[in-house]
Amino acid sequence: MLTLYHQERSPDATSNDRDETPETVVREVHALTPAPEDNSRTMTATLPPPPAFRGYFSPPRSATTMSEGENFTTISREFNALVIAGSSMENNELMTRDVTQREDERQDELMRIHEDTDHEEETNPLAIVPDQYPGSGLDPGSDNGPGQSRVGSTVQRVKREEVEAKITAWQTAKLAKINNRFKREDAVINGWFNEQVNKANSWMKKIERKLEERKAKAMEKTQNNVAKAQRKAEERRATAEAKRGTEVAKVVEVANLMRALGRPPAKRSFFSFS
């Protein structure tokens, strides 16, 4: 077998080198217990090389081999310590998880018992619901541990949410009732208003019809009065025209008579007796 310096080595040296190679040892993990070292391995590490190859092995190389073995032992111990610490942390987490789970189960059982012994639910939305039930042991002021306080605060929060839900439902129902009543009243008011408007329009149309009838009658009467006045005026005009014609004829006749006699008209006429 060839070495680092291209020299052949004997099978004995090869077997010695194989002995120097660290073996994989399967050990059980114990609390900080160092693993027993192999005597053959220690002896192999301390044996000198064969005489034929003593010139090729220097003292620093042997010292390096020994320091590597010590470093490997130290690393193995540190690895074992890390494995033990990790396993202990996992065990602690598992134990903590189991304790928390058992505590939650116990709290669930207490809550179920509390629900079984709970009083009848109040259906009145205006009822005052107490924050705590007497004798239930859920008083936050009592010193029963953080788990009991957490359960008490949870129960109080649930009660507050229930009361708030009831108040919200009552408020919604009341507002809906008020809004529906207002809508009905608004519909009634709108109907009454429309009725009054229709009644006023009907009265106005009736008055307009009466006014049209009266206007027609007044127009007819006016036309009759105008026609009558026109007839009377024509009669009076005819009478005045006839009188004027008669007087003109008298004056012409007197004037002709005076011309015939040759006498001028006197201050007081003979024919004027008035």
Curated annotation (Swiss-Prot):
Entry's induction text: Induced by mannitol, NaCl, drought, as well exogenous abscisic acid (ABA) application.
Coiled-coil region list: 204-239
Biological process, per Gene Ontology: response to abscisic acid; response to mannitol; response to salt stress; response to water deprivation
Residue pairs linked by disulfide bridges in the UniProt entry: none
Keywords: Cell membrane, Coiled coil, Membrane, Ubl conjugation
Gene Ontology CC: plasma membrane
Region annotated Disordered, chain positions: 1-71, 117-157, 218-245
Places the protein is found: Cell membrane
Mutant lacking the gene: phenotype: Slightly reduced susceptibility to Beet Curly Top Virus and Beet Severe Curly Top Virus. The double mutant rem4.1 rem4.2 displays resistance to BCTV and BSCTV.
PANTHER family reported for this sequence: OS02G0116800 PROTEIN, REMORIN 4.2
Complex and partners: Forms homodimer and heterodimer with REM4.1. Interacts with KIN11.
Protein name per its UniProtKB record: Remorin 4.2
Source species of the chain: Arabidopsis thaliana
